[in-house]
Amino acid sequence: FKIKANQKTFVTGDTLHLTIQNRKNTAYDSIQFFLRGERIAVPYIVPEDALLGDIPTEAAVFIEGKEIRATSHLRLLNKTAPSLYTYTLVNEFPHDKQAYTQGLEFDGEHLYESTGLKGKSSLRRVNYKTGAIEKQIDLDATYFGEGLTLINGKIIQLTWQENTGFIYDLESMAMERSFTYDQSKEGWGLCNDGTVLYKSDGTSKIWTLEAATQKETSYIEVTTHKTILTKINELEWVKGTLYANTYQGQKDVVVIINPKNGAVDGIIDFAGLRNKVEQIQGLDVLNGIAYHPERKTFFITGKNWSKLFEVTLQKK
């Protein structure tokens, strides 16, 4: 048995017709269809609040009391194209060009930064105006540092492929404990909305985690009107919306994501910024976005960038 749908891709509001391809013409008693594990009646109108992305689809075929399962995926895309944004440069500040930036977040006037590469990974508190490192905690050389976020007086820092995150006291930066990942296999970006954590793992998924236990509870898939985006990296939460660094099509871009369903509502093209930094060996992509609530500006840097840029955003 094989699941057949009336279209390859759908958007919310579409009517979904599911049938079973039964090549052997096997007699069966009944069929039940499921999307994301929940039984549906067909035809099925895709609700407006549906999660976007690749939807696990199942059919349960009943034959004389026995159940046979067929599995597939349906792709649910965003209804509208993302808005395009550009930036205005407000300020340039010095940034450590040896910092392979993986995470960036403000606490008042203090900028916290996580850096990567084995043997060079660290957690830092930085004076963003001077670039001076006020305090630095180096990770053991077995770890490759990734994203970070600040919540409830703690710093939470990810590592890449070591299946481990670290929790520090915000003020002293003393490490308190570690935790292991759940279903996500890697650590990339991290942010929070004041209640829960959001974690990217290099795929199309952004996971929601309980802040206290770091347990993964659900995920969204980052989806445009045409495709599903992967390599979602450093994250920032701003006024109910997720901002994510991602390197797409040879461009340094940040995507603006609806945290409820994964829809890409905007794309910010940061073309030109990388040309303004010292062109050293090892210079890498834009990765690092931090919002300053008082200044209402974004701070942008990259891996081994010699500058930290303060910008405002405008729709094109």
Residue ranges and their predicted role:
Residues 90-122, 136-149, 302-304:
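Beta-strand-rich domains and repeat architectures in extracellular enzymes and scaffolds
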Residues 88-94, 132-139, 174-180, 217-227, ...:
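A short beta-strand motif characteristic of beta-propeller blades
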Residues 77-98, 128-134:
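A short helix->beta-strand "capping" segment at the edge of beta-propeller domains
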Residues 97-108, 141-152, 182-194, 227-240, ...:
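Beta-rich, blade/repeat-based domains predominating
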Residues 131-168, 173-184:
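Blade-loop segments of beta-propeller domains
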Residues 227-263:
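Loop/turn-rich, solvent-exposed surfaces of beta-rich toroidal or solenoidal domains
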Residues 126-131, 169-173, 210-214, 258-262, ...:
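Short loop/turn segments that connect beta-strands within beta-propeller blades
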Residues 113-117, 157-163, 199-203, 244-249, ...:
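Conserved beta-strand positions in repeat-built beta-propeller and related beta-rich domains
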